[in-house]
Regions:
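Hydrophobic hinge/microswitch elements
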Residues: 128-133, 137-141, 146-147, 206, ...
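Secondary-structure junction motif
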Residues: 175, 191-213, 281-285, 297-299
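A late-sequence structural motif
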Residues: 259-301
């Protein structure tokens, strides 16, 4: 049994889908399928049920998954130690980041890091705030970057930048005329397009509404989307408002595709997460230092 076979098995088991697993680990579906079949044949076990185009773990597969994950974690710990011995000359740093940060704020930081340490392979996975925190807790990522607060006692949290949410509307929306708005107007006078629950953007907006004495469930939510771009496109096309990161909305505002409504929302923090009990690699420390010298407002200008 090889490390690659273990990694392939875990990827397929977690997704229960050959093609998605192959994409995640950058192999062809045929290579993934062959690896699983070879593993089953060599040990005389069946790890997956093939049900039409779907696959499901057998009871044997479910039991083996726990051991496979533990073994991979031990191997990665050994790899981390070796990369430490080599300093910052080579190695890998796995990052998870919430969408706003990953799409608009983090790429320039990653580019500067690559230029400084070209031998370190940076891997970035995008999720919402909750999935980013879960990845750091599980050891799938050494660092996570999220918007706003996160309630996870296993993690340390450091503010690396700040951002503001803006209420944006289409140019033909009534709020585009610059009229002063109250929190009550936000509830009564417009439909809304929102990010999904669990996203830092939505959590920050709902927390701000509570601070204004508004129950978030009273907002007239017309549509929910899993990405900032989808939210912005929907607002541009219809009679809805949205609360979105100023960084992500900046180009739309500059081009006149959207207008910022006259309602100020509190600033929020971009936070860097790491596990309190896991060793901090030199690469992660170097990246954290680079994060601390960037501000999203500079990126948006």
């Amino acid at each position: 049994m090889t490390f690659e076979q273990l990694a392939i098995f875990v990827a397929v088991a977690e997704r229960e889908h050959l093609t998605r697993a192959a994409q995640a680990i950058r192999l062809t579906p045929s290579a993934v399928s062959a690896s699983i079949k070879n593993l089953e044949a060599f040990y005389g076990v069946e790890l997956f049920h093939r049900v039409g185009r779907r696959i499901e773990l057998t009871q044997t597969g479910r039991v083996f998954l726990n051991e496979a994950r533990a073994t991979l974690a031990r191997v990665r710990a050994a790899e981390l130690m070796l990369s430490e011995l080599g300093g910052l000359q080579r190695g890998q740093l796995n990052l998870y980041a919430s969408q706003t940060i990953a799409s608009y704020w983090l790429p320039p930081v990653m580019m500067r890091f690559h230029q400084a340490y070209p031998g370190i392979d940076l891997s970035l996975t995008i999720g919402n705030t909750r999935t980013v925190a879960d990845a750091v807790i599980a050891g799938e990522a050494e660092l996570g970057l999220v918007e706003g607060e996160i309630d996870a006692p296993e993690l340390s949290s450091a503010v690396v930048a700040s951002d503001a949410l803006s209420v944006v509307v289409a140019p033909d929306h009534p709020w585009a005329d610059g009229r002063a708005l109250s929190a009550a107007n936000l509830v009564a006078d417009s439909l809304w397009v929102m990010r999904e629950k669990g996203s830092g953007t939505r959590s920050a907006f709902e927390e701000a509404m509570r601070g204004f004495g508004i129950v978030p469930q009273d907002m007239q939510v017309a549509l929910v989307f899993p990405s900032n771009e989808a939210v912005l496109s929907a607002v541009q096309a219809g009679a809805c408002a949205a609360a979105i990161s100023s960084v992500s909305a900046s180009l739309y505002l500059q081009q006149g595709l959207l207008v910022k409504a006259a309602f100020e929302l509190p600033a929020r923090s971009f936070r860097l997460l790491r596990h309190k009990e896991r060793h901090a690699s030199k690469a992660s420390i170097a990246l954290e230092q680079m994060c601390r010298v960037v501000t999203p407002r500079a990126s948006a200008s």
